[in-house]
Amino acid sequence: MQKRYHIHVNALLGQVVPASFARRWRCVFGVVALLLVLLCPALSHAQAHVNDTTRTRNIKEVVVKANRGARAVGMIKQTAEQLKVEMPADMTDLVRYMPSVGVSISGSRGGMRGFAMRGVEANRVAISIDGILQPDIQDNVVFSSYGLSNASRIDFDPYLASSVEIQRGANSFVSGNGALGGTVNYNTKNARDLIVQGKQWGAFAHVGYNGKDNLRTYIGGGAALWKHWEALLLATRRDGNELRNFAYGQRTRNITSTQADPISFAQHAWLAKLAYVPNEHHRLDWAFYAMNRKADAEIWTLEPIDAFTAEGKPYYYSHDQSLTRQASMGYRFTSDVAFVKKLAARLHYQVSYLDATTWTDYYRPNFDQHNGNMTLLHEGKRDKYRAQEIGDALVRLSLDTRKLSLGALGQHNLNFTTTASLRNYSSRNVDVENPVAANTIDGYTVRRGKVYALGENMGTTAQAYAFLNPIRRFNLAVSLLDDAALSPVLNLKLGLRYDLFHTTDDADNQARNTGYIAYLLQNVQGANMDFSPINNVQGGISALAVLAFTPKSWFNVAYKFSTGYRVPNIEEQYFQYYSTWPSFLVMSNRDLKPEKSINHELEITGKTNALAYMFSAYYNHYADFIELRQGVLTVSEPLMSQEKRLAYVTNVNRDHAHLVGFDAALQLYPDAWCPALRGVSLSSAWSYAQGESSSGMSMLSVQPLAGNVGLAYTGANSRWEVNAKMNFHFAKPVSQTTFWDRDAAGRDLIRRFPAAFLQNAYTFDIYAYYKIGTHITLRAGVYNLFDTQYHRWDDLRQLTNPALLGNINLFFKDGRKSLARFTQPRRYLSAAVEINI
């Protein structure tokens, strides 16, 4: 049994930031100076009025809390009302006004791989629903390189959320595995979110349209209170198509096509909750959530390796389905006098399916020896199915004590949490062929003793197989948190968490699942693939420390130290593959170590009746990044006269990386010094970071300098509101786009994005709502008002994903015209009607 542990103890070893970082920060000083110029006069005016207001001042991007506690440093919280106002259609819309957060795009089949923050993305940023981690992406180099798998992250409908919490920076103490760069947590709605105070029931309906991708949204539901019971039921449906951007020209089969692949999708989601509250101390609740997303596409821009298709048709057709069902039951006890202030227990079960279907008609070139012409003979249809099933079961117990007074050491609240979870993962592949007789010389084809006329269907053959046995991963986590008030103005949080992971497989099914690979390799010597049973133990310690000094409501300063880790997922660590043509190997690596991250962050916040502000500076260190290593093996076969060289790839722990950056946000309320401007507010948010790996390569997930400036006016009694945003999308410096590539001979190359690809852009959005009476709200927005053609860095860096990287030189040669299908949306309208009863 293998046994490995890692401890985040190198936090304070003083890693040196390269001097080049300092030289490149001049470009951001102007932004910081502008914020300070706006901030200083407002602060001086506000100090005299700080006790005269009861209004809550929130930065829309970052909620500023001036309470006497250690606040959540690096936290962005979007409320349900903010989500309604901004009308997000997907992950991209959810973070469009958060310059410090991006999205991860798969580069194939339109999949969203999750979020990007603090220089990392996808599986390195955890996603949770009500604090329960969601499945990560289980993908491998074989399927991702040809776009043959459903590589999207299971999404959550934001309209079913009461709030969305985005915690930037290493967060494994709270979220566990995968929170290297942060966590995105969706808090689901409760019955009281739909019920107006004083009523016993409520209902909600929403019909919306978003021109970005021709999205039609329908939402409906209701909630009720009856005696000690609370009930909620919500359902959503979304139908849409591919992004409507600046793609142009004729749709052709070409990796650099200027047209986007046609896509249609439908997504349904349901949320049901039932709670029994006998008194103020006890609460029982049951919850059910389900989401089913189906997407159909014609793939014109990714060429399969094993099919010759006809001109005028796509390379292949695809159908992807993402389905998840989640059920949970919880109990909560609260008391104002007992030693245990709060006791919470939760049982959770979830099953998720990620299915990908790919099919194409394939042809054989037929050359006329007399005139040299070539025709294509239809040889049949080929289907490839790939299915992944992920089952999660979880038990969690959490206990909070009342305040414990320790004299000069202050008051302490302790939290103890333990979690046990079990993940079951399995994948299956099915290849189906429907061949057609295509022997033009004889006019017939003999197959398995039967004669088929030219063009006749010759039946169906199917092969089912898997590259991995079903795998189980058990996780036990124990954490202790001390939330201490050392004085009225000084607070401290200290937390420590330990996670144990035990991974095993179903070895009894080895012959059924992986036997055919063993058959292919039985005579190949030197290709060391590992088919032994899996029995692996890994462990990790996570830490959290927050020291907050809050002398005034208008000035709070906090320092945060936190760590993160990510245990290699199943496909990364155990997937292995052998291809006879082209000949290459994918080798597993059972010795992979968990990835680790360390976050240091200093944050200054404050609020008055005139403003709310936030400035955060951070340094992140990452270690043991898991990346692909390519090489060549020398293998032999008994019937071969000489050895041959066989290319291989495998995952290894290779790079370390570091990142420095800042986030800033400011909200101004000019009516504090000019009552005539009541209802007017000004906002601005900015972010910049720069990172580099130990190999000298850039951290491509790092967002370039970005920001926005907003102007809002809210009418009396919040009956109507209009918002205007100017968005600044600055170009990524060429020096920060360095990455590895390989030439045709397999030699490593260092590349950078062409300067012509990297351009600044400025866009404008206007969105508003108007309430008709107390039950109806009209919402509308126009985005990219001046129809600006531009790319965000998230659009460009998907060229380095496995499905596109092998052809990136074609994009570089063709120039910006080859990027048309990756552009951001054209000017579009978003509108909705809401009814609240």
Predicted features, each with a name:
Residues T309-D336, F467-I471, G526-S542, V546, ...:
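Outer-membrane beta-barrel signature, preferentially recognizing the C-terminal barrel domain
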Residues K294, W300-A307, Y353, G455, ...:
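Surface-exposed extracellular loop regions of Gram-negative outer-membrane beta-barrel proteins
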Residues R57-L194, L602:
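Acidic, small-polar-rich N-terminal luminal/periplasmic segments of exported/outer-membrane proteins
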Residues A48, D261-Q267, H281-V340, V351-Q369, ...:
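Flexible loop and strand-edge segments within Gram-negative outer membrane beta-barrel domains
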Residues Y146, Y159-R168, F173-A247, N254, ...:
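Outer-membrane beta-barrel translocator/receptor signature
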Residues Q200, N214, G221-Y317:
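Periplasmic-side early beta-strands and strand-to-turn transitions of outer-membrane beta-barrels
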Residues S487-P488, L492, Y618-Y622, I626, ...:
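Gram-negative outer-membrane beta-barrel transporters
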Residues A623-D624, L628, V680, F730-A744, ...:
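C-terminal beta-signal and adjacent terminal beta-strands/loops
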